[in-house]
Amino acid sequence: AIIGAANSLIRHNRDRFPVEGVPIRRDADPANPSLVVFDGEKTEKESLAWFVKALLHLHKAGRGWEEFAVLYRSRQSSRAVEEALVRAGIPYRVWSGVAFYARREVKDSLCYMRMLTRGDDAAFLRTVNSPKRGFGPKKADALKVLAMREGISYYEALKRHIDEKPFNTKAIREYVAVIEKARASAAARKVSDVFNLIMADSGYEASLQLSGEDERLNNLAELRQAIANYESDADDPTSLPEFLQRASVFAEDIGEQKGPAMKLMTIHAAKGLEFPVVFLWGFSEGIMPSSRTSTMEEMEEERRVCYVGMTRAKDLLILCHSQGTSEASTFRYPSRFFFELDRNLVKLVRPLEPGLEESAKEALMYKDKFLTGEPLESSSWRPGDHVRHKVFGDGEIIAVAKSGAMTIRFPTLATPRTLMAGAPLERISTAGAPTVADSSFSGAPVPEPSAEPGVKDQK
């Protein structure tokens, strides 16, 4: 079923003659064939809960941890998976890459936040010259001598001697001013606000933008999402020290783990490898394929990448999709590649929501016109229009992109959502017209994960 499903996908490529895979395993059990499973959840939190439940179920049934692999399109997608595995106590290793909380930009950002609480020497040395402020090894050595002699931290020594050479430079003074300003307000702010403040005022995020390091910016966005998830999950207002304590658990080094462990890696790193059980994570439009896909040629390459990911599985392939990363995140449809698969070869964990497939295909049709360069009909939607969505309720359009995608503010959600062109919307009133009263959330209740993951043991 896995090879058959992958072949049904790659047949949609037109520019190159598709090379289809042929099942050649001699040890395959005809009574227990390979299986393709699709799991679609409302939120990433629910998707992770089902993922962990499926892992534990399969492990209890006899699967060793070394038999599992999680593959993803890009490295930033590993963050949520790593956190879920740490919480569940499931051993894993990140192959051909670095664990999320060990990545440079993530460690730098967390150290900036640590400077607002403890101001420890390790956090100071990591942040004082990131971005570059002319604080090299000579200045660091001179500061260490002062700190040791006076029995204080490096940062306190810097503040005490800020008017002396070689520390009295404009850039170093600005660093101290940024830390002191953020410290003064951190206790009264949400963690997410503190993070945004320190990233902006320190110039750290801007330095990544100027460098063009998209992957590092994506990891920074993932850390921002982790903070938002932490705040939404907490019953009480969270403090910065509490968040840093939680992050430290995920940041512990797991590289020296001994014994069997799951493998996490990008699809690119998995080329040439095979695993008994594969979870293809982020099987959502905008992730797989990437939202940056702008031509049909690029879309065909995305399809080939997906084909490679699918064919890494020997016994069981699980395609994991969630409509959003949180209750307030951007709405996502399942990957277009899901709709291209031979559905006779795919087992659904639960039925698709009524109307989801039709609305997704309508939106994807509009995107395909954009990819092929066909003239797009001028969007009838304008900022200020009031609309009704069958799941999110009533909202107001606040922006319309050239591609037709719309950013909509729904009173029932904490932040605006971006919906693809062609999303099923009912017009309530046009921009400038009187609006109706905000309606309450009218979406169907989210189904609870089943008692069992709905996946038969595959050996």
What role is predicted for each listed range?
Residues 1-91, 114-118, 375-378:
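Helicase P-loop NTPase motor core
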Residues 37, 72, 266-269, 282, ...:
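Flexible glycine-/small-residue-rich
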Residues 74, 97, 131, 269, ...:
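A generic "binding-loop/recognition-motif" signal
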Residues 64, 78-84, 88-90, 103, ...:
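Conserved helicase C-terminal RecA-like lobe
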Residues 148, 282-415, 421-452, 457-459:
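C-terminal accessory regions
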Residues 71, 95, 102, 281:
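Active-site-adjacent beta-strand anchor residues
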Residues 89-99:
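Conserved RecA-like helicase motor-core motifs
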Residues 47-54, 108, 222, 305:
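Well-ordered alpha-helical segments embedded in enzymatic catalytic cores
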